[in-house]
Amino acid sequence: MTPGLISILVPCYNQGIYLKETIQSALASSYRPLEILIINDGSTDNSLQLAQELETQHPEVRVLDQANAGVTKARNAGIAATQGEYLLPLDGDDLISPDYILQGLAILATRPEVKVVYCQAEKFSNSGRKPWKLKPFSLQQLAKDNMIFVSALFRKVDAEAVGGFSEDMQLGREDWEFWIKLLKNGGEVVQLPLVGFYYRLTPTSKRKKTGGTAFKKARIAYLNAKHADFFERELNGPLRIQRTWSKPYNTLLKFFGKL
């Protein structure tokens, strides 16, 4: 591990059309030392070729090539291969601002009690951009829904301590489950006031694919099975389909002796 080094993990599956722009936004960071690890997850477009070209052009860029295994395994492969003290996942079509890492690591490097630093964000597409309105962080709010996008800053040692991203989480929102296991036993979270992350909206965005009722039910069942202790502590019982009603509903059931 190289002290002070930030490793940007860029899993990429058929995102060649956006990959160069994503890497350019990472290279434009005002923070150094920096490495960018592109994990090609079995792409069938020109992503691997583009990644290798970027690798030859920029000493900060390295490429891993693997058979298609999904984003969680791609991120974990990146974590295992990185040299950085700090990590920042960045999907192959999203962007970051030049000062995001610099401001975030100013906090992580000096405040050991802080586990995660993120920022304000915007969603964008060809038709324009708009603020991504996120609720303030608290553990109880995290139990109901995620407010930390995956492109946050954290320490490699903390990610390794919880086993990285759960590779059996194939239902979307794998970042939510990662933050739960990273933070449920302690650690502070800081949100920077700057807009530092830009989430690209595309017709194939994963959030659109995994937003249906069946996915939601399966996802909630998975989370309850894996983090029952967390939901009991924060919501007085399991997470419900109507997530914001989980705590009052559980409290009512316990009052009547039905939970």
Q: Over which residues does each language-model region extend?
A:
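Conserved donor NDP-sugar-binding/catalytic core segment of glycosyltransferases
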Residues: 99-131
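Acidic helix N-cap motif at the loop->helix transition within catalytic regions
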Residues: 20, 45-53, 95, 99
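Short aromatic/hydrophobic "clamp" motif used to bind/position activated sugar donors
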Residues: 87
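Cell-envelope/extracellular polymer assembly enzymes that use nucleotide-activated donors
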Residues: 4-7, 35, 175-177
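Short, acidic, metal-binding catalytic loop of nucleotide-sugar glycosyltransferases
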Residues: 24-33
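Glycine-rich, basic loop-to-helix element that forms the pyrophosphate-binding segment
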Residues: 66-82
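A conserved acidic beta->alpha catalytic loop
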Residues: 40-50, 69, 91
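Conserved nucleotide-sugar donor-binding catalytic segment
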Residues: 138-216
